[in-house]
Design a protein with these regions (language model features):
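Short beta-strand/helix segments in adaptor/scaffold domains that form protein-protein interfaces
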Residues: 1-128
């Protein structure tokens, strides 16, 4: 796929650089656009998972998106019984293909770090 925006990037930027950049944009979008979203039920969780997936797939060069939200419901059942999405509740995998490079990036809560870590899971480059 031709990229009409490529001319705005430095000529030093490789396909690998752009694939990694685009993967970071996708994860940043998920974290900064959707954290704070109110959730009350498992149905809300499923709808939000699908919304995040569709939003990220709408961005350029996305091949695949997987979203899982970890949700613990409070047993009170009252009118104020809801929670809001946090980055640590998301398990997100995004696959981006730009030029000759494919990147799988992940956002996942790492208990050892007590942090929702965004990281590169895999990089593949096609040999020409």
């Amino acid at each position: 796929m031709e990229d009409p925006a490529a001319k705005y990037f430095s000529t030093k930027v490789t396909s690998r650089d752009r694939a990694v950049f685009e993967a970071g944009v996708a994860i940043g979008t998920a974290v900064h656009q959707f954290t704070g979203t109110p959730l009350k039920s498992l149905e809300d969780v499923r709808v939000l998972e699908e919304a995040i997936k569709r939003a990220l797939l709408a961005q350029p060069f996305r091949e695949r998106v997987e979203v899982k939200i970890h949700f613990e419901r409070s047993p009170s059942g009252g009118p104020y019984d809801y929670t809001t999405l946090r980055a640590r509740d998301m398990d997100l995998r995004v696959v981006v293909k730009y030029g000759s490079c494919r990147v799988a990036a992940r956002l996942k809560y790492i208990k050892e770090l007590d942090y929702a870590l965004a990281y590169i899971e895999d990089i593949e480059e096609e040999v020409k």
